[in-house]
A protein has these predicted regions:
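Conserved ABC ATPase signature
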Residues: 53-57, 61
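ABC ATPase "signature
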Residues: 138-139, 147
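Conserved ABC ATPase "signature" region
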Residues: 30-48, 157-158
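A short, surface-exposed alpha-helical micro-motif characterized by mixed small hydrophobic
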Residues: 120-122
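A short, proline-enriched helix->beta-strand linker immediately N-terminal to the Walker B motif
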Residues: 72-76
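Hydrophobic anchor residue at the start of the ABC signature
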Residues: 16, 67, 95
């Protein structure tokens, strides 16, 4: 939940400005106000939201405000741990599109931690698959998604739902074959 990382007693402006103040980039929230407003607009939130409190924002809005705070110090690497898991699918898609656009515009690298393979397929250039705390496969995203080598990765990808019923039936048969090989 992106809201859990915000201080509920502070406005969105104060929350977004906090890393800027801690790292002495600005002397006060008032000094950082224009930059915070720019950050909010960058993540598609109106400047007026600076005066709101976290509980006044929807989940998607809190996620975008959290992204603004994460980008405040202009990082070269952003670590995003399950950033869309608490959001409904339509909001997820908007946040992911925003994320892709900002990554292209600003040029930061991202370590995106997720269990959602549709998100991985949409965002990743490179993939690392973990099973029981161990890395079992890593490489180019297209290679891993289209031609996985590790048995766990194969089962993981075979378990994904497919919109086409005929293709889904083939997908399930392949998953059952993989599971039978394991037995």
């Amino acid at each position: 939940d992106p809201g859990s990382s915000f201080n509920p007693l502070m406005t969105i402006a104060e929350n977004v400005a906090e890393p800027l103040l801690v790292h002495h980039k600005y002397g006060s929230v008032a000094d950082a106000k224009n930059y915070v407003g720019d950050l909010l607009e960058m993540v598609q939130l109106p400047r007026a939201y600076m005066n709101r409190f976290p509980h006044e924002l929807s989940g998607g809005q809190r996620q975008r405000a959290s992204l603004a705070r994460g980008l405040a110090l202009k990082p070269s690497l952003l670590i995003a741990d399950e950033p869309t898991s608490a959001l409904d699918v339509s909001v997820q898609a908007k946040v992911l599109e925003l994320f892709k656009r900002l990554q292209a515009e600003i040029g930061f690298a991202c370590l995106f931690i997720t269990h959602d393979l549709a998100v991985v397929d949409m965002l990743a250039d490179r993939i690392m698959v973990m099973h029981k705390g161990q890395i079992v496969e890593h490489g180019d995203a297209d290679q891993i998604m289209q031609h996985p080598e590790n048995p766990y990765t194969k089962k993981l990808l075979a378990s994904l739902p497919v919109p086409d019923p005929r293709e889904q039936q083939q997908h399930r048969a392949h998953l059952h074959e993989l599971l039978a090989q394991e037995a």
